Amino acid sequence: MKGAGRGPSAGTGALCVLAASVLWGTTGTAATFAPDVGPLAIGAVAMGLGGLLQALAAARRTVRAAPRLRAHRGTVLLGAVSVAVYPLAFYSSMRLAGVAVGTVVSIGTAPLASAVIERVVDRRRLTRRWTLAACLGLLGTALLCVAEAAHASGGAGGRSVAGTLVGTGLGLVAAATYALYSWAAHRLITGGIPSRAAMGAVFGLGGLLLLPVLVATGAPLLDSWSGAAVGAYMALVPMFAGYVLFGWGLAHVPASTATTLSLLEPAVAAVLAVLVVGERLPVAGWTGIVLVVMCLAVLTVPTRAGAVVREEVTRPGHVPARAPTTGS
């Protein structure tokens, strides 16, 4: 597949996605420093300003790639709409169902959504290696979810069943849109468009779509230095820097692999909640983190042939020129 090389390039791509996931894992903890700012404002400032910064940083490349981007305008628009919907659903999910449940549902089910998209649209067949990694990661995130939800329900401020259900539903919307914009960006990149130009176009348009939401809900961000600092951090670090890294990663690994590697995010979020916010994580939660790490190891450890896995999916009927390294 064009744009997804073997060996070291795939390893570098995986590391870029993992680094992005670490940055994303800080967002839940950062948001706790601005408790008076609503989830729509947090999502709009994070992805909106972060997306516009990406567009500005990639402006020259985007202009040079404009003819090819216009030829794929449908994919660009799908990615941009998904970019706009994702943060609104994600942060609202965390506010309604809790940070643990919202993060785990949103990120933990994204690999399944990516797999469905690639199977239906690209007609790719999942391999045993990807399936094993996804099962480990989903089991780990489920344990994190159950452990932290049980711990939270033991406190005084339990959430309503209706709020939890709505929050979980919004988490599923976030997972689907995350998978969609990852797929769209990967499709543009592997179609010959430079990763910076593809990400700049998709996230720049998504940022423009989020500006009205930011104008309508963002006033509390300016009411205090802490709110402004959180907004600036969200836009610059996890969203701008994180998605630049994610774009580089998507140039070398499929969207299904990238979304599976990003299962590191809820594990990072849980650890930071313990170390920074002061939450307590039960044994089941730590077990979940270990399973997530095992999931990442399955995807990134070199195979017997000495190459790092680059595609955990194979096109049906395609006979590779050399033995595949995906364990299928």
Language model: regions and residue ranges:
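Transmembrane alpha-helices of multi-pass small-molecule transport proteins
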Residues: T12, D36-V85, T109-V116, A176-Y181, ...
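Hydrophobic/aromatic residues within transmembrane alpha-helices
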Residues: A34, I42, S93, V120-D122, ...
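Hydrophobic transmembrane alpha-helices of multi-pass small-molecule transport proteins
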Residues: L49, Q54, L126-E148, G155, ...
